[in-house]
């Protein structure tokens, strides 16, 4: 009886590891999609209404995407609390601090941090050009993450289940 219970627990934990690895890949794609939408909103606000960055951050705190809300609420709080620091510094530190919580990969985080070089610094056209470059790079990174999910996601799940079955066969 103990062997059976132990076998079920080992199988469950190995399968959970495989499924967790697949879920992390899926979260990376979802986070990239959400941040692409946020960058699109920032770009449209800068080009259309010439809205200042603190107001844009306020708009994004009410976004329906939980990833966007989390990042920009943290940024808005930091803007209020640490108003002596530049927007670029706060943007970078917020994105790096929230990276693991919202499921972004290191590559996506670095790409988004590059937007700090443009936001709030230059005239609207320079900001839009910089944001377009960041969006293109993030879209390419998102496609790579989607490809990883398609190629490796099922592999991780299957390997987790197979490892669980292998351990059970060895134990029994």
Which residues make up each language-model segment?
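Juxtamembrane/interface alpha-helical elements of multi-pass membrane proteins
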Residues: 3-80
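Bilayer-spanning, highly hydrophobic alpha-helical transmembrane segments
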Residues: 6-17, 143-172
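Membrane-interface, cytosolic juxtamembrane amphipathic helix immediately N-terminal to a transmembrane helix
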Residues: 27, 33, 114-161
């Amino acid at each position: 009886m103990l062997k059976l219970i132990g076998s079920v627990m080992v199988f469950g934990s190995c399968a959970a590891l495989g499924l967790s690895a697949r879920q992390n890949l899926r979260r990376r794609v979802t986070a990239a999609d959400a941040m692409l939408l946020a960058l699109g909103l920032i770009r449209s606000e800068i080009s259309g209404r010439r809205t200042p960055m603190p107001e844009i951050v306020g708009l994004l705190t009410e976004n329906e995407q939980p990833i966007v809300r989390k990042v920009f609420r943290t940024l808005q709080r930091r803007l209020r609390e640490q108003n002596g620091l530049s927007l670029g510094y706060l943007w970078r530190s917020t994105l790096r601090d929230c990276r693991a919580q919202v499921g972004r990969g290191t590559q996506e985080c670095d790409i988004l941090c590059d937007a700090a070089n443009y936001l709030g610094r230059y005239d609207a056209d320079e900001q839009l050009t910089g944001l377009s470059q960041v969006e293109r790079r993030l879209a390419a990174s998102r496609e790579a993450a989607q490809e990883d999910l398609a190629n490796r996601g099922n592999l991780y799940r299957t390997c987790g289940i197979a490892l669980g079955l292998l351990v059970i066969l060895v134990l029994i």
